[in-house]
């Protein structure tokens, strides 16, 4: 592990929730792509992720990265049961909006809007928060995501 924090160059830091792609910069040095071992590549699950500084940073702990990536893939890409992809992304956007992660909210809101074709509703969630007025089904999904995020036992 590096013994110092990186200080990113001047850049526009997000101040509001958005569906736009945000400029993510690490606070710790990601591994160089050339330094990735076969174990790192296995943990990435998809070799294309080696191009991403985000995933190369997570690769510093291959066991955690592999568990995180397999969990992520199962949550969002598993076609055997569960909610449609748009609503999985909606739940993730709501959880991110609730816990205040502008970066994760932007990713999941973008996917929720793309898959659902309900851009205005997704934008309302971002603008107004998890109390935004949505239709009955989407409100139930948002409420469940918030309850699970707040305290799993509340769910």
Predicted regions and their residues:
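Hydrophobic alpha-helical segments
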Residues: 1-155
């Amino acid at each position: 592990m590096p013994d110092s924090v990186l200080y990113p160059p001047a850049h526009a830091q997000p101040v509001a929730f958005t569906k736009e792609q945000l400029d993510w910069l690490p606070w710790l040095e990601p591994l160089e792509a050339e330094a990735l071992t076969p174990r790192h590549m296995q943990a990435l699950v998809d070799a294309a992720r080696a191009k991403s500084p985000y995933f190369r940073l997570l690769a510093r702990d291959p066991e955690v990265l592999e568990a995180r990536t397999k969990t992520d893939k199962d949550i969002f890409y598993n076609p055997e049961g569960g909610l449609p992809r748009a609503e999985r992304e909606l739940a993730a956007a709501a959880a991110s909006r609730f816990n205040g992660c502008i970066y994760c909210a932007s990713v999941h809101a973008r996917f929720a809007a793309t898959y659902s074709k309900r851009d205005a509703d997704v934008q309302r969630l971002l603008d107004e928060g998890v109390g935004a007025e949505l239709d009955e089904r989407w409100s139930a999904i948002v409420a469940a995501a918030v309850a699970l995020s707040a305290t799993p036992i509340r769910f």
